């Protein structure tokens, strides 16, 4: 079987998995409620803003920290968003595990050990 065929088969298996099915159900539920959708999108926007500032070494103001903490508290009280974020996290773990399996035995790039031997 060709590698691309295997990749397509893996994609189908993921799409039919319990994890993905649950994630999709929760996402659809969030997207069908404008208030919940807006709250999630605001949370994600603030999260990206703070992470971006951290990565770039910029200062996060007290106001930004407080605003983010407030929305995090609201998110934790909203079971739909909390379940969705948990499912999204589990999908991320699944993809990371699959990536480790796929690339774990491959020698791609130059290792630190190979760099030091001349």
From Swiss-Prot:
Coiled-coil annotated spans: none
Q: Highest taxon of the source?
A: Bacteria
> Which InterPro entries has this protein been placed in?
Com_YlbF, YheA/YmcA-like_dom_sf
**Any Pfam family hit:** Com_YlbF
Q: Which protein family is named in the record?
A: Belongs to the UPF0342 family.
Q: What is this protein called?
A: UPF0342 protein Hore_03100
Annotated organism of origin: Halothermothrix orenii (strain H 168 / OCM 544 / DSM 9562)
């Amino acid at each position: 079987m060709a590698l691309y065929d295997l990749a397509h088969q893996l994609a189908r298996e993921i799409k039919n998995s319990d994890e993905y099915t649950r994630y999709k159900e929760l996402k659809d539920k969030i997207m069908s409620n404008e208030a919940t959708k807006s709250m999630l999108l605001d949370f994600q926007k603030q999260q990206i803003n703070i992470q971006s500032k951290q990565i770039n070494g910029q200062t996060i103001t007290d106001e930004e920290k407080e605003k983010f903490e407030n929305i995090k508290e609201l998110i934790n009280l909203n079971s739909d968003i909390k379940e969705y974020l948990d499912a999204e996290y589990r999908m991320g773990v699944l993809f990371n595990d699959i990536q480790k399996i796929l690339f774990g035995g491959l020698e791609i790039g130059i290792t630190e050990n190979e760099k030091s031997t001349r």
